[in-house]
């Protein structure tokens, strides 16, 4: 999904054509009742796109590139039977579609407006693409027969007391809790980064005997928050050039069960994961023709961690930390990353580590390019009045 969002960001900025195809022969039609051994089919190696001049990206095997010197770049993103095609060359787009339809039974869906449950809204004047999942939220509410009674400005209370509980298999399951958490997890992965921290808490208790009514109540609060922010979407693209930056944060003190890690140690682990993702994104953007002009900047709000990485200091309290977690320091020494300090209030990653007050939560959502849309049709399932959080200015 990260590759898909990055591709859409580049496509929106360049104002490329964005179309989709759906293959009809991906799965076998018969129902197998016996164990059958088969030889690998000739088409399994994927020679169709190679014959059309596409090469597989070394960064993501589902991304195929064709970068001729005389024609605009052409990108194809494949997910099982769904293909996303992006290029500025309309004649080449029609030719590739025709060749694919000759080799496979597929349906031309035209311009991309939905993908894997995501609604895609494009504003070519502003060169933006907005991703939403309001339809999926409505389906989840209908399937669970959920009716909200109170709109929420945040997905999780900043005073929550959810913590680890001993396993008690005699406790009856509190509703469809695992199913609900799974649905919310997919929303968070695709278009709702504001749900990352609440789901990191709720997902710890999906096992039978682990969740109690209070956990189900917390999950229902997330649903109320989704009702309040149903028309909000993730905005990609814009006219500014691509600048790759990252934010890392950790909050071991907010762990109500244990607080065993020091703040510096937790920040080192978080910095290593963020540096790894930035390093990978650098290669992905290079494949898409948007190689960063300077090393990406990783912002952290812990000065102790910054000192260990920048000054190559050795402290007796950090000797137990494996060297692999000092990836940020290694990349900085190579000139492939730059570490910088940022105040906690300006650290975007803070929303991923703790439950915030409504004003702080909304501010970080804005920093994540997560805005309210000027489209009230997604509120038809609920009240004719606009829900909380929708009456905001559409921002670029």
Residue ranges and their predicted role:
Residues 22-25, 45, 56-87, 100, ...:
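Catalytic palm active-site di-aspartate
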Residues 8-16, 224-248, 290-292:
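Structured nucleic-acid-interacting core domains from mobile-element enzymes and related host factors
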Residues 7, 22, 38, 49, ...:
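Mobile genetic element proteins and their domesticated derivatives, centered on retroelements
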Residues 2, 7-8, 109-232, 343, ...:
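C-terminal reverse transcriptase regions that engage the nucleic-acid substrate
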Residues 114, 205, 243, 264-396:
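RNase H-like nuclease module associated with reverse transcription
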Residues 27-35, 255-260, 307:
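Cytochrome P450 core scaffold surrounding the K-helix E-X-X-R motif
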Residues 184, 243-265:
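RNase H-like nuclease fold core
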Residues 1-77, 82-105:
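Metal/cofactor- and membrane transport-associated sequence elements
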């Amino acid at each position: 999904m990260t590759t898909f969002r990055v591709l859409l960001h580049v496509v929106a900025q360049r104002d490329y054509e964005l179309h989709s195809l759906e293959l009809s022969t991906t799965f076998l039609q018969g129902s197998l009742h016996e164990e059958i051994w088969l030889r690998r089919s000739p088409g399994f190696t994927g020679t169709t796109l190679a014959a059309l001049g596409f090469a597989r990206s070394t960064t993501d095997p589902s991304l195929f590139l064709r970068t001729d010197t005389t024609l605009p770049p052409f990108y194809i993103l494949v997910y099982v039977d769904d293909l996303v095609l992006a290029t500025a060359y309309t004649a080449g787009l029609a030719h590739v579609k025709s060749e694919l339809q000759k080799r496979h039974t597929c349906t031309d869906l035209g311009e991309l407006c939905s993908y894997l449950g995501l609604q895609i809204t494009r504003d070519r004047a502003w060169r933006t693409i907005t991703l939403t999942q309001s339809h999926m939220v409505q389906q989840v509410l209908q399937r669970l027969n959920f009716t909200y009674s109170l709109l929420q400005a945040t997905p999780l209370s900043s005073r929550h007391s959810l913590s680890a509980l001993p396993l008690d298999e005699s406790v009856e399951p509190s509703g469809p809790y695992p199913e609900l958490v799974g649905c919310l997890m997919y929303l968070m992965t695709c278009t709702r980064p504001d749900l990352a921290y609440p789901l990191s808490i709720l997902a710890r208790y999906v096992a039978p005997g682990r969740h109690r009514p209070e956990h189900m109540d917390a999950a229902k609060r997330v649903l109320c928050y989704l009702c309040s922010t149903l028309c909000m979407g993730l905005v990609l693209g814009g006219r500014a050039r691509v600048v790759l930056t990252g934010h890392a944060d950790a909050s071991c003190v907010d762990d109500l069960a244990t607080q065993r890690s020091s703040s510096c140690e937790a920040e080192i682990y978080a910095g290593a994961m963020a540096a790894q993702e930035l390093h990978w994104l650098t290669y992905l953007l290079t494949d898409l023709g948007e190689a960063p002009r300077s090393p990406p900047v990783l912002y952290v709000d812990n000065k102790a961690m910054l000192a260990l990485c920048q000054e190559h200091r050795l402290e007796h309290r950090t000797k137990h930390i494996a060297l692999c977690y000092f990836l940020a320091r290694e990349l900085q020494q190579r000139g492939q990353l730059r570490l910088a300090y940022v105040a906690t209030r300006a650290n975007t990653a803070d929303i991923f580590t703790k439950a915030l007050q409504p004003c702080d939560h909304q501010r970080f959502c804005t920093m994540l390019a997560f805005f309210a849309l000027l489209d009230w049709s997604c509120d038809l399932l609920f009240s004719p009045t606009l829900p909380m959080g929708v009456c905001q200015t559409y921002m670029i």
